Amino acid sequence: MSDKQQFIRNFSIIAHIDHGKSTLADRLLEIGQVTNDRTKKDQILDSMDIERERGITIKANNATFDYLADDGNTYTMNLLDTPGHVDFTYEVSRSLKACEGVLLIVDASQGVEAQTLANLYLAMEQDLEILPVMNKIDLPAADVEKTKIQIEESLGLDSEKAVAISAKTGLNVKAVLEAITKEIPAPKGDPKGPLKALIYDSYFDPYMGVVIKIRVFDGSIKKGDRFLIMSTGKDFTVNEVGINRIALTPTDGLGAGEVGYLIAGIKKVSDAKTGDTITLFSNPTKESIPGYKEAKPMVFSGLYPINGEQFDELVDAIEKLKLNDAALIFEKESSVALGFGFRVGYLGLLHMEIVQERLEREFNLDLITTAPSVKYIIRKKSGEVEEIDNPSRFPEPITIESTEEPYVKATVITPNEYVGNIMALAMDKRGIQLDTVYLTQDKVQLTYELPLAELIFEFYDKLKSFTRGYASLDYEPSGYRISQLVKMDILVNGEPVDALSMIVHRTKAEQRGREIIEKLKDLIPRHQFMIPIQAAVGGKILARESISALRKNVTAKCYGGDITRKKKLLEKQKEGKKRMKQIGNVEIPQEAFLAVLKTNN
């Protein structure tokens, strides 16, 4: 280990959403004097507007600052800010790989939450030093002693090491930096060995191309070096290398233990994927850093412009967004009802919301989304196996041997009094209870296995409303299970509406179908003829509603006179309606689609 390495500390902050992670990062950077009055703003490391508004971190970020400790030494602090949401767990695991220790924040007024535990396990897997920090001790509801007990019992950490702070007011934040210098070890690594560096994030800049954020484990890299990306074998030359002091700051190079960035004229983020290993072309390392994997989408939906003329703009926008989001996958598709659009794959529901919001906000598009679905496995009688995420590709029932759907292991942490509500919700969502653990007298951890398709359909909203917002949720994939799945079509005037088709569990088909057709009945305007709206599986109608016809008074012009004259006019009208019904197209207004798809989302 070089002398320089002794005084480097690489650490990350992990926490449940809203426990004060970005606020603590702001205070640490103020002490490190990398922010001044001009650059100072809340959530410095959250660079997107959407991150600030929602109060969440989406992209992993970092900052380097110097700290003069009480022992008289100046330490180089590398803070890696990580996303807190379950959708971005892979990004968190790669950022943690670049660290030697973590600050684990627990809100002293809320206690331990589901994602606190999930992120703690990620840190333990990487064998990192874990430093507990109790935040928000300035709040009247804060209970430091109770939080200490939870840190001992629920997390299995030494509460004596826990630092009690208020990130908002800055109270005791300096003690956190002192604890980092004492508790978190200096980075190991051979400064003279062949280069081995981890890409823990990358983003696209319109002027510089792809900016790669790296942590160097062995060796060093400088401007002009030719390097290899190990998973693809592609090589590039370094144009600029440096560290991030909020603004990118070029340096002579990066050595073992250091965290920084490099620019090499790379055009696509997919050429420098998170988790990949960089080594020198002239003296490559033998093995890459373990743990790299491709991000797999879990949730899929159709994305269409409300105004069909905006399709070319949507193509342009989604390709630009892809430059910054390697996990996003998409392919063109068309729908009779909605026109041309895309089938898009996301990491999870939050990722889906963020992609849509960014497309609408940054590219000024009006979009409509079809109901989210997951990837199903269909085993056919012919021996073929198909993976489908789009109801339109669901094969004929007669050809199917079995169907499988993805399940997740979901952990819910809730106050004691809401356990009954959650059990009822999980039962309704076809959940299987695996475990119940009392974390404290009034906090319970429930573990369930449930279908991902049920989790993405209203589960989170219902969980929050059933527990008045107190419950927290975390989930991870747990493989596929055989399930009785069917394709449900919605027929309007006998014609299936492709945008409203969905794959559902046989036991849920009637209930879901009824919800949709009741909504459509209120939204489709009346026509001159009666319109049946039906939910059907195969040839079987599960539910039906009718929109009654508008009645035109054709006998109004007959004043008294012969009854046969009136009958003749009524018969003529009847004939006309019959013909109209056969050839009449029912226009489904855009609002009807939006409203129905909203229920599905």
From Swiss-Prot:
The keyword Ribonucleoprotein does not apply. NCBIfam families: lepA, small_GTP. This is Elongation factor 4. It is a peripheral membrane protein. Belongs to the TRAFAC class translation factor GTPase superfamily. Classic translation factor GTPase family. LepA subfamily. It is found in: Cell inner membrane. It catalyses: GTP + H2O = GDP + phosphate + H(+). GTP binds at residues 18-23, 135-138.
